[in-house]
């Protein structure tokens, strides 16, 4: 493709970034202190195919636990797998926009998460890509991952909404892009045949995908070879085997340099005579939709009798494209491409802080899909121009775009028997809440993203189909009932009644009375009318039923149970929504739960074989990676779907001591979970991690499987580095991170105008996270309220003759903040608007040379009402091509960050400290704890100490030694010592297991 960098294979940067054990045992931190959370080096596509080929030759379909361990896959495999069955979508015949072609599909050929390798995997990084427009998406490309390594959490989210997610991409490009590679290394693998002519790796690939629960493979094949007869034969063999396996949602997606499909190319790129070869993205022409859409539709029909799987590609670097041409070939699907490591929707999104960025991201997606008004029933006119990614002239990004809903019908999978439930979770949160109160810190997990609304947002005058703008719905991360987000309804003007139609459904009560549970929060003291109503539309009567949610009695979250007494079992509900009555511009209501349930009950299968990996352990915190299996009959494919075990989701629980109070700290639909930085307050805490399954009835629970996580000796653990503002850090999965570590840093920083001033110099790069906490170096800017201050800042100037590049801070935006109200965060608004943003320097997608050639002077005034006392100034630089990463917390892109100490003095009246509007106090214990839990035997911490001759083990039942390429070097049973003479010099990864606790440590053999 034009102007794009070459896709790189997964790197070992994450593995090698942490310091390995050397000869000095006294200074070695324990294995559990490792900050390397994931290790995907075993997920090499060819090695995986060869493993499954061996398994097939042995007459089996999937690997044993021992084979997974020996291949270096065991600790990560459940984070790659999806146990959520892809749900079927309802008929689109009654689609909202009847001018669309009912069967027209959308292929989002973009990254799954931001960054390669670990992008999209569960983490503690709240501000992360949580794509949510599955309600229009048929196929998702997972472009930032190699084959068979797309995150299972994303597959779970996709499958809940009826979307297929490819396992990753194979990249070939010989069109002239730097570093482009051909398919010469791949073709000999896939064209290998047995003596009977069958393809050696065809059945293994299908079995591998079925075992992972992922839906196919993705090709960028801008090189020769795709039309080789053996390659075509292999691809067609995959479809034939998938059909025999009833693997109906298997896909090969491919695009080449071709912008059109012809009778000549159809067999290689699409199929012929009813034999499928691939789903095809027609390459864009000059970045835009090809003019060959109509002829390609004709060629597809001639070859296969259908256009299903044919997509016209467009490069969304720019949204000023030939959208009007899409109506010339309505039977052709649409494919949005862009870009390699993070999607254009994510990279173009901006926000002053993490909350604003995450909220803006959902709104940007909504304008891109539902149209610039964020209402699919009220879309701007179709135009090929003025569809701007960035805010222009006060107009929000994509605010004039017609939206993909103009061409693509909406989709929904909500059908069958009750219950139905949503917490309006979008898969991320600044903290984890349970029933309104905090139980854990920042989190990101797409496997805890609820089924998304069918319509974003379909707002009408009550009881009509007249478009209304009197209520503005949005997802908010400022609060949550359970999880990390909620639905926020805000009034814009007076209205007698406004309907928000959320879900298209085909739901039926099967037994007993039908009830609804709705959690709401107004944030206002005292008893108040919520003016909120649950509305359900009955399929047979074509009528809306309305039920009052009731009053709020205070400012905190409240859950209301509503008896839907006039709905009998067997009644079919085909829409669910909310109605607001008598609203005005001051109306605001948060909705954190919407559940419809009946008397159906059925217990889930029990959880078993829980394994805990301890990560990032400090004296006062630790992170855990938990994985488990389920006590049910194994499927032929080796993959058990949750619904086969009557499981809706899993809950991760925490308690302090065997009899401690229990908290829910995470939910997931995967058979694995990561919980970061569990607060243990002091080294004497005795954490237990529990896992249980929740039934499809949403009220039955399996027994909790408890594991005591024995703490490492506190004297060997590092201190938890605390930063009340949270430390920003370089995104190591983003392109150019290593360059940033070498040449992107602030060399000089001077303040003028204070009672005391700062004069900071750096003589070398920072490296690591590229963040400097200079608040501890003794220098302080002391400044009185109302004083004008000048700062002078210079970035290091890189030179080609010295650094082999000039990729320094000139290519960045820079922005500064001061905490002026002592709330330990940085208000994103500018000083002139009452915020805490001091300045912004740099230009979008350009270099600004004076940021590195001399001291750049910036002047601002400390507000008269700034709070006095110690505070902090933060300056963050982020790449000028990714303005969305320019925020005071979280990860920045190819940049640098630094904090300085500030002391504000004065006697003028001070601005107040903002109140924390979250519910306060200790969270309730989870429901259903009456079921007796099961506690695994206590496992003492595994320890590894290295001397000149051996690796010495303590409390280790099994150990595995891996080279940096993922090769297994040794398997050890009950080891006490291992002679290192058998290992060549280099870095090795040692995984140690005691009972069901795993710790990992790196060692260097010299």
Predicted region positions:
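Chitinase-like catalytic core of GlcNAc-active glycosidases
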Residues: 97-292
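Extracellular fibronectin type III
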Residues: 697-713
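Short carbohydrate-recognition loop motifs
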Residues: 469-499
């Amino acid at each position: 493709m034009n102007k794009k960098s070459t896709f790189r294979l997964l790197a070992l940067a994450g593995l090698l970034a942490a310091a390995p054990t050397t000869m000095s045992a006294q200074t070695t931190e324990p294995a559990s202190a490792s900050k390397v959370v994931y290790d995907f080096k075993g997920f090499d596509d060819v090695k995986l195919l060869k493993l499954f080929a061996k398994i097939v030759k042995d007459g089996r379909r999937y690997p044993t636990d021992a084979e997974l361990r020996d291949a270096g896959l065991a600790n990560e495999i459940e984070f790659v797998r999806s146990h959520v069955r892809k749900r079927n979508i309802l008929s689109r015949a009654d689609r909202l926009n009847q001018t669309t072609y009912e069967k027209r599909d959308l292929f989002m050929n973009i990254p799954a998460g931001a960054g390669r390798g670990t992008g999209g995997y569960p983490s503690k990084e709240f501000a992360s890509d949580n794509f949510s427009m599955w309600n229009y998406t048929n196929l998702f490309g997972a472009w930032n991952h190699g084959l068979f390594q797309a995150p299972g959490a994303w597959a779970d989210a996709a499958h809940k909404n009826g979307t297929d997610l490819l396992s990753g991409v194979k990249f070939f490009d010989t069109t002239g892009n730097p570093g482009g590679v051909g398919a010469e290394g791949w073709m000999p693998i896939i064209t290998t045949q047995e003596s009977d002519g069958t393809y050696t790796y065809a059945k293994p690939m299908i079995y591998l995908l079925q075992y992972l629960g992922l839906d196919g493979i993705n090709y960028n094949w801008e090189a020769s070879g795709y039309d080789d007869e053996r390659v075509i034969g292999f691809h067609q063999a995959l479809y034939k085997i998938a059909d025999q396996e009833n693997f109906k949602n298997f896909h090969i997606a491919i695009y080449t340099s071709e912008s059109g499909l012809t009778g000549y190319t159809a067999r290689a790129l699409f199929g012929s005579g009813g034999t499928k070869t691939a789903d095809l993205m027609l390459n864009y022409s000059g970045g835009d939709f090809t003019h060959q859409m109509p002829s390609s539709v004709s060629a597809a029909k001639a070859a296969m009798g259908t256009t299903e799987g044919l997509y016209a590609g467009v490069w969304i670097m720019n949204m000023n494209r030939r959208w009007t041409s899409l109506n010339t070939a309505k039977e052709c699907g649409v494919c949005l491409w862009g870009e390699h490591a993070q999607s254009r929707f994510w990279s173009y999104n901006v926000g002053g802080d993490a909350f604003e960025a995450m909220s803006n991201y959902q709104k940007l997606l909504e304008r891109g899909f539902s149209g610039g008004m964020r209402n699919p029933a009220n879309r701007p006119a179709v135009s090929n121009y003025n569809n701007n990614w960035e805010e222009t002239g006060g107009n929000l990004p994509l605010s004039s775009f017609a939206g993909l809903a103009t061409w693509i019908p909406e989709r929904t999978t909500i059908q069958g028997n009750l219950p139905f439930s949503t917490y309006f979770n979008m898969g991320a949160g600044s903290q984890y809440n349970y029933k309104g109160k905090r139980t854990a810190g920042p989190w990101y997990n797409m496997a805890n993203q609820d089924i998304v609304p069918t319509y974003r947002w379909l707002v009408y005058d009550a009881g009509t189909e007249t478009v209304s703008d009197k209520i503005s719905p949005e997802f908010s991360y400022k609060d949550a009932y359970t999880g990390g987000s909620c639905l926020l309804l805000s009034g814009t003007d007076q209205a007698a009644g406004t309907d928000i139609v959320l879900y298209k459904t085909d739901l039926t009560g099967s037994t007993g009375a039908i009830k609804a549970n709705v959690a709401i929060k107004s944030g206002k003291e005292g008893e108040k009318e919520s003016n909120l109503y649950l509305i359900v539309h009955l399929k047979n009567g074509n009528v809306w039923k309305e039920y009052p949610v009731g009053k709020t009695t205070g400012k905190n979250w409240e859950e209301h149970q509503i008896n839907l007494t006039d709905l009998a079992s067997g009644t079919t509900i085909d829409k669910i929504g909310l109605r607001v009555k008598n609203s005005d511009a001051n109306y605001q209501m948060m909705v954190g739960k919407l559940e419809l349930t009946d008397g159906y009950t059925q217990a889930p299968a029990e959880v078993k074989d829980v394994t805990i990996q301890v990560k990032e352990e400090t004296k006062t915190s630790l992170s855990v990676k938990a994985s488990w299996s389920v006590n049910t009959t194994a499927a032929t494919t080796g993959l058990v779907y949750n619904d086969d075990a009557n499981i809706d989701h899993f809950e991760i629980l925490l308690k302090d001591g065997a009899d401690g109070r229990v908290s829910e700290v995470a939910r997931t639909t995967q058979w694995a979970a990561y919980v970061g930085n569990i607060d243990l307050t002091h080294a004497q805490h005795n954490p237990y991690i529990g896992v249980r399954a929740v039934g499809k009835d949403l009220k039955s629970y399996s027994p909790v499987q408890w594991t005591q996580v024995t703490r490492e000796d506190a004297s060997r653990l590092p201190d938890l580095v605390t930063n009340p503002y949270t430390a920003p850090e370089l995104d190591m999965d983003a392109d150019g991170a290593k360059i940033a570590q070498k040449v992107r840093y602030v060399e000089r920083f001077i303040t003028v105008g204070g009672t005391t001033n700062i004069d900071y110099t750096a003589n070398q790069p920072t490296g690591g996270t590229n963040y400097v906490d200079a608040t501890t170096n003794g220098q302080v800017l002391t400044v009185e309220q109302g004083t004008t201050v000048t700062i002078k800042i210079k970035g290091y100037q890189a030179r080609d003759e010295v650094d082999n590049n000039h990729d320094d801070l000139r290519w960045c935006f820079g922005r500064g903040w001061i905490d002026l109200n002592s709330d330990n965060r940085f208000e994103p608004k500018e000083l002139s608007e009452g915020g805490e943003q001091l300045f912004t320097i740099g230009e979008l997608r350009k270099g600004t040379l004076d940021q590195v050639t001399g001291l750049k002077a910036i002047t601002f005034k400390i507000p008269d009402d700034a709070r006095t006392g110690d505070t902090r100034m933060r300056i963050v630089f982020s790449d000028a091509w990714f303005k969305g990463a320019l925020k005071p917390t979280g990860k920045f892109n190819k940049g640098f960050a630094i904090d300085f100490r500030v002391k504000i003095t004065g006697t003028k009246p001070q601005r107040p400290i903002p109140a924390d509007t979250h519910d306060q106090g200790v969270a309730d214990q989870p429901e259903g704890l009456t079921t007796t839990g099961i506690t695994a035997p206590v496992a003492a911490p595994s320890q590894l100490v290295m001397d000149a001759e051996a690796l010495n083990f303590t409390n280790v039942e099994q150990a595995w030694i891996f080279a940096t390429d993922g090769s297994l070097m040794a398997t050890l049973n009950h080891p006490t010592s291992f002679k290192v003479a058998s290992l060549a010099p280099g870095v090795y990864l040692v995984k140690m297991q005691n009972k069901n606790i795993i710790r990992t440590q790196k060692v260097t053999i010299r």
